[in-house]
Each structure stands twice: as C-alpha cells, then as structure tokens.
C-alpha cells in the first residue's frame, strides 16, 4: 500500500493533529483502543495508508508527535485519543522554544532532531511503499516553525524522492499570540518555498471569520477552529484513504496542482460548514455544494480568490451523487467565471468523487485552490516583518542563538520574489504573439 507518515510538531500541530486522528479513526471505524468496529469493507480497503496493523488486528496511527516542551504532549497522551498512539512516537524536549524560530531551528530543536529522525526511519522501514510525509505545524511559534522546517530539511536529505506535504497555520493580524510571529513566519516560508511539494495554508483569521459569520458562534475557542481544520484535512486526504472513481495520491495531487515548483501554496475550502456537534438539517444538492465551495467565505486562508486567478483547482466530493452532475456543475462554474481561471492551462479543474461522506453529513465537498491571490497572505506577513526588521526590533533573541541578520534579509527577499512570481502569472495571458515579441526585443536595462 502507498503509506503516508504523519508528523505533528509544536503545540498547534499536536492539537490539530490529535483532532485529525480523532476524525479519521472514526471514519475508518477504529475505536480508541485501535480495534476495528466498523461495518463497511471500504473502511479497511486502504486503511494502511495512515495506520499500521500491529499484533491481533490492532491499528496504530503512523504518526510521530514532537514538541520541545512536555505540556501539549501530556495532554494528548491523557486525552481520550491518547491510547491510540504508539508510546515510542512521542518525542519531547523539556526546555521549550519560547516562540523563537532560532531555538527551534538551530539550538534546542537541533539537539532533539536525531531522536525524531530515528523514529521517522523506524516508521518508514515498516512501510511497503512509502509515498510521502505530511506535517502539521504553525508558522508563528518557535517549535512548529523552526524545528518543523529543520525536520522537513532533514527528511528531504534522506528521502529526496518522496513527497513532502504540509498543513501550515499562518499567523494572522487579528489573532496574534506573540509579537515576533512575522519573523518566525517569514523565516519558515523561506524554507517551505524550497523544501516542500505542497503546502496547505490555513489561516486563523479566516477560521475566526467562518466561526463568527457562517456558524454564528459568539466566542469561538481553538477547539472550534481545530474542528474546521480537521474537516478540511479529512477532506483533502479522502481520496488517499478511500477507493473512489478518481483516486489521487500525494504525487498525483502535486502533478495536477503545481504548475511551477515554487508556486505550491494552496487555499483549502470546505462545504457545507457546520459547527461542532451540530447536525445538518437538510442535505445540500450538488449545485449548492459547488457554489459554496468556490465562495470566498468558505476559504480557510484569509485571501479573496476574486482578486486573483486560479492556476489550478482540485475538488473532492463525498457522498452518494452522480459524477455526471458534478462534472456539469464544475464546467458551468468555469464557463460562467472564465476570467477567474488562467486560460493558458486548459482543463485546470480536477475532480474526485468518493462514496463515503464524513460523519454526520450526507454530502460534503473539499476544495483545494492554487490561486494567485494567496500572495495577499505573504504580503501581509512580509509588511509586518519589514516594519520590525527595519528597526532591528527583537533581533537580539535570534542573533543570541547564533543567527545572522543576512538570513533575515534572504528570507524576506525570497518571500517577496514569490509574491512577484504569483503576480506575474496572474497578469500572464495566452497570447503567443505578445510573448514572442517580448522575447525578440529584450528591454534595455537602464
């Protein structure tokens, strides 16, 4: 089977990760002791993608939990889903990274990284045919961002031909935990541009907006936000976990979604959006799902897709529905809104249909868009970064761990280059003559 090794790192990564395992073990009929108690053969058909089958039909998540302080790990271990995980796969330091990227990447994290790599190797050895890794982390703290990117680099060195997929929680201006978030985020983005194949950008601000506007929650907790993220993650990984009519693995997803290697930052979306514990009263039709799924308010990244253009899109529909109807709906979205899709990539919307809906819903749809508007997210963080970096504010915390100012300038430059690349492809047209003229008369440099 094509296995995926799952890594969750830092406080945010572990909290979302625990929720993710709760959702998918439920979908596959695995109870908290790791025993199968479902009733559909489809649940077991591709269970090996995320679970190891241990002795006497016990299923154990192929998951590695990492943090630089014991707190979050202890709460995951003692939560109701704790017994499901393999005890050896909990790896933690005791010092913490103190929201400092340099501690996670160069000092504290670097001391722990070999222990993590041993567990990674161990997990990879028990795979028949490893397809890749997925890592959940946030970019605003110290461990998820600093040590997370260090781990990505190490895995890249050792398994260069395997897909590296990340779910990265990007800091947002309205919901800030620490002042140095922009530093940590830009230093991480610099690494993600070079070393990952696919990055799903999840944004706390967008999640809060969904909770306030759509779900009408007055004071949303991190639990509510994590619920939304786990819905999306479960949706994105559906076609990897269940047999369906158009099955994707991580590599096929990357081939369909990434037209240029650096432009691999996706906006996820989900429909229908429901609050935790609430049931949906009526089933949505395929046209309603499609319309909601492309709606800016359903996006998990705080960018407006209408201000950019889609390079590529992947949609995953779940539930019993007619594939033909799904195809017709998506075709109509493309023809009615053709200006929002770049014309130089024909057929840039791909669809997968899986018969098993998520718990509590008859039908659902997950959206993955590679839209040039994602640059708004990078511009936002980059502006905050520059404001502090120009005054060298808080820099001593980083240089004290052995970092150099050059690294900051380099990361900022790389992020700004990424923004220009997105802008360039947003403005690009399919006119061949125009392109040839530009080639023929190179502009004179002033």
UniProtKB/Swiss-Prot annotation:
GTP binds at residues 11, 69, 138, 142-144, 204, 226. One of its GO terms (molecular function) is metal ion binding. It comes from the Eukaryota. The keyword Heme does not apply. Residues 419-446 are annotated as: Disordered. Its main location: cytoplasm. Some glutamate residues at the C-terminus are polyglycylated, resulting in polyglycine chains on the gamma-carboxyl group. Glycylation is mainly limited to tubulin incorporated into axonemes (cilia and flagella) whereas glutamylation is prevalent in neuronal cells, centrioles, axonemes, and the mitotic spindle. Both modifications can coexist on the same protein on adjacent residues, and lowering polyglycylation levels increases polyglutamylation, and reciprocally. The precise function of polyglycylation is still unclear. Some glutamate residues at the C-terminus are polyglutamylated, resulting in polyglutamate chains on the gamma-carboxyl group. Polyglutamylation plays a key role in microtubule severing by spastin (SPAST). SPAST preferentially recognizes and acts on microtubules decorated with short polyglutamate tails: severing activity by SPAST increases as the number of glutamates per tubulin rises from one to eight, but decreases beyond this glutamylation threshold. Mg(2+) binds at residue 69. The keyword rRNA processing does not apply. Its cofactor is Mg(2+). SMART domains: Tubulin, Tubulin_C. Highly expressed in bone marrow. GO terms for cellular component: cytoplasm; microtubule. GO terms for biological process: microtubule cytoskeleton organization; mitotic cell cycle. A motif (MREI motif) lies at residues 1-4. It is found in: Cytoplasm, Cytoskeleton. Residues 430-440 have a biased composition (Acidic residues). Keywords: Cytoplasm, Cytoskeleton, GTP-binding, Magnesium, Metal-binding, Microtubule, Nucleotide-binding. InterPro entries: Beta-tubulin_BS, Beta_tubulin, Tub_FtsZ_C, Tubulin, Tubulin/FtsZ-like_C, Tubulin/FtsZ_2-layer-sand-dom, Tubulin/FtsZ_GTPase_sf, Tubulin_C. The MREI motif is common among all beta-tubulin isoforms and may be critical for tubulin autoregulation. PANTHER family: TUBULIN. Dimer of alpha and beta chains. A typical microtubule is a hollow water-filled tube with an outer diameter of 25 nm and an inner diameter of 15 nM. Alpha-beta heterodimers associate head-to-tail to form protofilaments running lengthwise along the microtubule wall with the beta-tubulin subunit facing the microtubule plus end conferring a structural polarity. Microtubules usually have 13 protofilaments but different protofilament numbers can be found in some organisms and specialized cells. Belongs to the tubulin family. This is Tubulin beta-6 chain. It comes from Gallus gallus (Chicken).
């Amino acid at each position: 089977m094509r296995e995926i090794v799952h890594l969750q790192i830092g406080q945010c990564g572990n909290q979302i990760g625990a929720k993710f395992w709760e959702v998918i073990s439920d979908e596959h009929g695995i109870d908290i002791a790791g025993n199968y108690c479902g009733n559909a053969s489809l649940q077991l058909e591709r269970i090996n993608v995320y679970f190891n089958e241990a002795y006497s039909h016990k299923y154990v998540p192929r998951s590695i939990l990492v943090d630089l302080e014991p707190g979050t790990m202890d709460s995951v271990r003692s939560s109701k889903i704790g017994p499901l995980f393999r005890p050896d796969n909990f790896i933690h330091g005791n010092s913490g990274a103190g929201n400092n990227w340099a501690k996670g990447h160069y000092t504290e994290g670097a001391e722990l990284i070999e222990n993590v790599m041993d567990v990674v190797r161990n997990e990879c050895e028990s795979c028949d045919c490893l397809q890749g890794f997925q890592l959940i982390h946030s970019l605003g703290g110290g461990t998820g961002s600093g040590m997370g990117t260090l781990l990505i680099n190490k895995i890249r060195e050792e398994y260069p031909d395997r897909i590296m997929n990340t779910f990265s929680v990007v800091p947002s201006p309205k919901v800030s935990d620490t002042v140095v978030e922009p530093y940590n985020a830009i230093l991480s983005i610099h690494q993600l541009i070079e070393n990952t194949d696919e990055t799903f950008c999840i944004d706390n601000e967008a999640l809060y907006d969904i909770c306030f506007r759509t779900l009408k929650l007055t004071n949303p907790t991190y639990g509510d936000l994590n619920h939304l993220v786990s819905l999306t993650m479960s949706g994105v990984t559906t076609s990897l976990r269940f047999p369906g009519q158009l099955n994707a693995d991580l590599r096929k997803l990357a081939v369909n979604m990434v037209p240029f290697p650096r432009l691999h930052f996706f906006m996820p979306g989900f429909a229908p959006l429901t609050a935790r514990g609430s049931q949906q009263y009526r089933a949505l039709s395929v046209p309603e799902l499609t319309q909601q799924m492309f709606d800016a308010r359903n996006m998990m990244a705080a960018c407006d897709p209408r201000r950019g253009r889609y390079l590529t899109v992947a949609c995953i529909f779940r539930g019993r529905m007619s594939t033909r109807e799904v195809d017709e709906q998506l075709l109509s979205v493309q023809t009615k809104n053709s200006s929002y899709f770049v014309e130089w990539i024909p057929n840039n919307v791909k669809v997968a249909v899986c018969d098993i809906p998520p718990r509590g819903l008859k039908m659902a749809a997950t959206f993955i868009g590679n839209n040039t508007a994602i640059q708004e997210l990078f511009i936002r963080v980059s502006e905050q970064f520059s404001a502090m970096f120009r005054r060298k504010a808080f820099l001593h915390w980083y240089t004290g761990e052995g970092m150099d100012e050059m690294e900051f300038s380099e990361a900022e430059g790389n992020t700004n280059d990424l923004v220009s690349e997105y802008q360039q492809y947003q403005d690009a047209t399919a006119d061949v003559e125009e392109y040839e003229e530009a080639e023929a008369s190179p502009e004179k440099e002033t």
